[in-house]
UniProtKB/Swiss-Prot annotation:
The gene is nuoH. It is an enzyme of class 7 (translocase). It is a multi-pass membrane protein. The lineage of its organism: Bacteria, Pseudomonadati, Pseudomonadota, Alphaproteobacteria, Candidatus Pelagibacterales. This is NADH-quinone oxidoreductase subunit H. It comes from Pelagibacter ubique (strain HTCC1062). The keyword Glycoprotein does not apply. One of its GO terms (molecular function) is oxidoreductase activity, acting on NAD(P)H, quinone or similar compound as acceptor.
Length: 332
C-alpha cells in the first residue's frame, strides 16, 4: 500500500507540472501570433474565444481529427517514434526547473548538467524524423538541424561554465540564490546576449529556422508529417522554447527572486516572478521572429564557430582571472 501511495504522489506531481506546461505552450503560441500580427499592423487570432485565446485549442482539435499519413517508403517504426522522442525530451527537462525553493519536481545537485544533457538529446528526434521519412527535403532539414544544434550547444555549454565559475555549484537553486544581491546579467551581459542568440538557434527559431525553411525545404524534417504526429513536433518545439527562456531566467535574471527586495515586491510569490521573467524572454523571442530576416546557412555556421565560441571562451578566461585575482572563487 505504501508503494501505491508513493506512485500516486509522484504521478500527481508529474501531472501538476506537465499540465501547466502544455497549457502554457498553447498560450505562448497565441502570444507569438499576436506579437507577430502587432508588428505587421494586423489583428492576428481574434475569432475563436475572447481575444482569440482558444485558437490553439481549435488547432489542437484540428490536428487530433486529421488523418495521420505514414509514407509507404518510410521506416515506419522510427517515423512514429521521432515526434514522441522530441516531445518527451522537451517535457522531461522541466522536472528540474525550480519555481521557488520548494516548487521543483526534482531538486538534484546536477540540475544544470541534466538540463544541458536532455536538451542536447532533442536533436535525435529531428534526425530520426528526417531520416525515416525517406525523402530529400526532410533529410536535408534534419542534417541542417543536427549541424546547427551541435554548433550552438558548444557556445551554450561554455556560457554555462561562466555562470558556474561565479557560483561553484550545478544546483539550479544555488545558482538562483547566488544572484540574491546582483543578477548575473549585469557582470555577464555579453554572455547573456550570446546565450539568447544561441537559444534561438538551438530551438530553430527565426532568424535561424533553416531546418524548416519554407522557401527552400517546404517544411524541412516535418514535411511528411500530418495530424497529431505533426502536432507533437510543434508541442516539443514550443516546450523547448519555454525551457530555454526558463534557463535564461535562472542563469541570468535571478530565477524566482524578486527584482527589488522591498515591500510590496517581496510579497509576490517566487513562481509569479519566474513566470514574468520567462514571458519577458519569450516576448523577445517573438519580436526577433517578427523583425529579423532569415540567415543563410553559411552565415549561421560562421557566427557560431568564428564569433560566439571564441568570444565565450575568452570570457571564461576573463571571468576566472577576475575571480582568482580578487579571491572571489566560490570553491576552496
Amino acid at each position: 500500500m505504501e508503494y501505491l501511495n508513493i506512485i500516486f504522489l509522484q504521478t500527481y506531481k508529474i501531472l501538476f507540472l506537465l499540465v501547466p506546461v502544455l497549457v502554457s505552450v498553447a498560450m505562448i503560441v497565441w502570444l507569438d501570433r499576436r506579437i507577430w500580427a502587432f508588428v505587421q499592423k494586423r489583428q492576428g487570432p481574434n475569432v475563436v474565444g475572447p481575444f482569440g485565446l482558444l485558437q490553439s485549442l481549435a488547432d489542437a482539435l484540428k490536428y487530433i481529427f486529421k488523418e495521420v499519413i505514414i509514407p509507404s517508403s518510410s521506416n515506419k517504426v522510427i517515423f512514429i517514434l521521432a515526434p514522441i522522442v522530441t516531445m518527451t525530451l522537451a517535457l522531461v527537462s522541466w522536472a528540474v526547473i525550480p519555481f521557488s525553493t520548494t516548487q521543483v519536481l526534482a531538486d538534484i545537485n546536477v540540475g544544470v548538467l541534466y538540463l544541458f544533457a536532455v536538451s542536447s538529446l532533442g536533436v535525435y528526434g529531428i534526425i530520426m524524423g528526417g531520416w525515416a521519412s525517406n525523402s530529400k527535403y526532410p533529410f536535408l532539414g534534419a542534417i541542417r538541424s543536427a549541424a546547427q544544434m551541435v554548433s550552438y550547444e558548444v557556445s551554450i555549454g561554455v556560457i554555462i561554465i561562466n555562470v558556474l565559475l561565479c557560483v561553484g555549484s550545478l544546483n539550479l537553486n544555488d545558482i538562483i540564490m547566488a544572484q540574491e544581491n546582483l543578477w548575473f546579467i549585469i557582470p555577464l551581459f555579453p554572455m547573456f546576449v550570446i546565450f539568447f542568440i544561441s537559444a534561438l538557434a538551438e530551438t530553430n527559431r527565426p532568424p535561424f529556422d533553416l531546418p524548416e525553411a519554407e522557401a527552400e525545404l517546404v517544411a524541412g524534417y516535418q514535411t511528411e508529417y500530418s495530424g497529431m504526429m505533426y502536432a507533437m513536433f510543434w508541442l516539443g518545439e514550443y516546450a523547448n522554447i519555454l525551457l530555454m527562456c526558463a534557463m535564461g531566467s535562472i542563469l541570468f535574471l535571478g530565477g524566482w527572486l524578486s527584482p527589488i527586495d522591498l515591500y510590496p515586491f517581496n510579497l509576490i510569490p517566487g513562481a509569479i516572478w519566474m513566470i514574468f521573467k520567462i514571458l519577458f524572454l519569450f516576448v523577445l523571442f517573438a519580436l526577433v521572429k517578427a523583425v529579423v530576416p532569415r540567415y543563410r546557412y553559411d552565415q549561421l555556421m560562421r557566427l557560431g564557430w568564428k564569433i560566439f565560441l571564441p568570444l565565450s571562451l575568452t570570457w571564461v578566461v576573463l571571468t576566472a582571472s577576475y575571480l582568482f585575482y580578487f579571491n572571489l572563487l566560490p570553491v576552496n
